Amino acid sequence: MASDVISINLSDEAATDALAQRIAPHLLRGDCFLLEGAIGAGKTAFSRALIRARLGRMEDVPSPTFTLVQEYEDPEGDIWHCDLYRLTHPDEAFELGLDDAFEHAICLIEWPDRLGSDQPANASRLAFEALANGHRVTIHLSDTMRPRLSGVVGFA
């Protein structure tokens, strides 16, 4: 993991959308965001905005809470949006095909702690926190994503 860390206050849904729109065009196959935070902290809202920005259209992006995985076809790399909250063991994640997705898709993983020690080493971590007025996201960019995203998210 990178030592670079930045926190961004997102005052409303439009600010979350804007951040996702800045990030989306720079993602490549094999990129993974580990999305941390309590229920209602903004993980799904960010994922929804990033998926829509990446696909370039208003897409129905439901929370994968009950399906565990929602997959979206993108010519430049499929997008996997995963909610692992209901998993009880890391092996269950790999029964879903996540190991292959980590290599060949763009992955947005909510509740990544369910992966245990099997979290991808090249993943960036976004920690969301609900505030009285909006949300805060603390971004830890991985070494592989830092060159493409550091200027986009505000690292010097």
What are these regions (language model features)?
Residues A24-G30:
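Phosphate-binding P-loop
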